[in-house]
């Protein structure tokens, strides 16, 4: 997966916006659904992406896939860093992005989910 495929997959989801919100990290591209982050990457090198995960799955994924590691700057109980080293199939990376999006949507308020469904 290259950066454009990653971006295209993320931005195609309902209610998603993209931004560079971290002033001191100007190359970090963040994708959010209704203002809640579900994935991010450093576009200067695209070495890895971060995705939100169910806490029950975090350790299992790290033990199963060498490319899945704890992230440097995010909560290690809820997020994983996936190295974009071509050892994990693109289809699985897309699934993890989808799971991250779904997890964030699930945790939106009823009003926010209603707003998302209307968009």
Question: Model-found features: residue ranges?
Answer:
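Charge-dense, helix-prone N-terminal extensions
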Residues: 1-119
């Amino acid at each position: 997966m290259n950066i454009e495929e990653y971006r295209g997959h993320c931005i195609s989801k309902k209610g998603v916006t993209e931004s560079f919100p971290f002033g001191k990290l100007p190359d970090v591209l963040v994708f959010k659904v209704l203002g809640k982050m579900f994935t991010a990457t450093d576009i200067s090198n695209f070495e890895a992406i971060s995705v939100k995960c169910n806490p029950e799955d975090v350790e299992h994924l790290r033990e199963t896939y060498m490319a899945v590691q704890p992230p440097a700057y995010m909560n290690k109980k809820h997020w994983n860093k996936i190295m974009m080293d071509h050892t994990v199939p693109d289809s699985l990376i897309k699934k993890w992005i989808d799971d991250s999006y779904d997890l964030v949507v699930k945790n939106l308020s009823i009003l926010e989910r209603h707003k998302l469904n209307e968009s």
